Amino acid sequence: MKETIIELLEAAGTQLKQQGILPADAPLTVKVEPTKDKAHGDYASNLALTLAKPAGRKPRDLAEALVAALPPSDAIRQVDIAGPGFINFFAATDAAAQVVPAILDAGDTFGRSLSGAGEKVQVEFVSANPTGPLHVGHGRGAAIGDCLCRLLEATGFEVTREFYYNDAGAQIQNLALSVQARVQGLTPDDAAWPEDGYRGAYINDVAQAYLAGETVVADDRDVTASAAPDDLDAIRDFAVAYLRREQDLDLKAFGVAFDVYFLESSLYDDGKVDATVKALVEGGHTYEEDGATWLRTTDFGDDKDRVMRKKDGGYTYFLPDVAYHLDKWQRGFTTVINEQGADHHSTVTRVRAGLQALEAGIPQGWPDYVLHQMVLVTRSGVEVKLSKRAGSYVTLRDLIDEVGRDATRFFLAARRSDSQLTFDIDLARSQSNDNPVYYIQYAHARVCSVMRRAQDAGKAFDRDLAMQHLGRLDAPQEKELMNRLARYPEVVERAARMREPQQVAQYLMDLAADFHTCYNAVKVMVEDDELRNARLALGLATRQVIRNGLDLMGVSAPEEM
């Protein structure tokens, strides 16, 4: 319907240009949005207001001219002008109802498009250090990142999901020392415990597995513990593999899988970090000061220059990030999206500046970033801070065990990524309309229940009969529901383009509300065969869109609740 109205207004604008009412070069950028008050129609456009100045006319006068020039259409039953010049459109019932067969015909593909066909996108997300269990912040990144990948795939892009393992550096050394301390019989309360060591109960789990000589399978490698208490390298390799496996198990339970696991250590092993340093030095963008090597990132928009190589010869953490992103570019990913925590904000400018300094043909502003804010977990209104397993934070596994995968995924992705999120465990577990996951899933299950009742009553759905009488879906609640269904493809397209998965979550909440309102207002199981089947068809269309939307969120659509 929205596309139809845009086409009608474009045709009217073209006619006004031919009549000399509009300048020939006036931009016909038509915007049409659903109205908030249905007394003002189903859709509205401000085209007359945007064209009034180039036309040299009052907006309302121009609106009248545009309405007069609209081609006739069976899809529109009424057009009004409101306020200073808004044009309001009332959709004809028959036209609004055509979304029902469109949905039923398309099925699982309704809402999908090929707008990104032929384009490759790499999405890096989670990318947790293999030093402990995944925390709720990683969980939010996993939910947002995976939903974003699903959205991009739904709009035709070829998506590669990538996990970057920071398996080099001081934190890995601290992990190895912590596990070694446990292997040697120390506890976190002992004075000899490593100063920056990890203290969670999982460290003891790793140590016991190491002493038992276990073999760990993680992603691309098998590591067998040597059980030698003094072999720090062996302990390090085993601990990293063990915790990578644990993170993999958490992600599997969360319904998230990756195509590529990239190890930071491989950048050093393959000489890519040294090659990046060499290219930056040869490019003339570095200088020596106080025994360190600095990169002139201020030449590329940073607020100050950054140390690249420290006095002791070690690299700062952003240097391997530059090498890693150069590798992404060289792999042919012209579009890269990094979903990370907001604590990475300071690295965005540095990495982009480093990439520009390489003069490798990488465009400014590459890669894209989606940064999420922190998650606060509450129970009974009180913040939950600790996990028995991790010791210092709430883990993703804690949440999944508490409220299940569906609620965890939906809640973590249902708000704007740049907004702090309060995860209310009590709300996520509740079976009430206040719980958005329950509310949406219940709408799906409710349709399934109606279809079973129809079957049991000997009144199975007759699609042919339903399609002949969709025009009888003329109750205001039915029309509002059909209009909402028609907006789904646009929501998917916009959410993918804007990198905002929460738009799908909000749409599903609105759709569920419209469905429950309609269900409570009009009786489905009436004796009138024509009307009953038309309403069953509307229910089936609603069920399909809910299922499609929940799939984009990585959430199930149960048939019974």
UniProtKB/Swiss-Prot annotation:
HAMAP family per record: Arg_tRNA_synth (MF_00123)
Motif range ('HIGH' region): 128-138
Record's GO cellular component terms: cytoplasm
Encoding gene per record: argS
Species name: Chromohalobacter salexigens (strain ATCC BAA-138 / DSM 3043 / CIP 106854 / NCIMB 13768 / 1H11)
Secretion signal, residue range per the UniProt entry: none
One term of GO molecular function: ATP binding
EC number: 6.1.1.19
Protein name (database record): Arginine--tRNA ligase
Subunit structure, interactors included: Monomer.
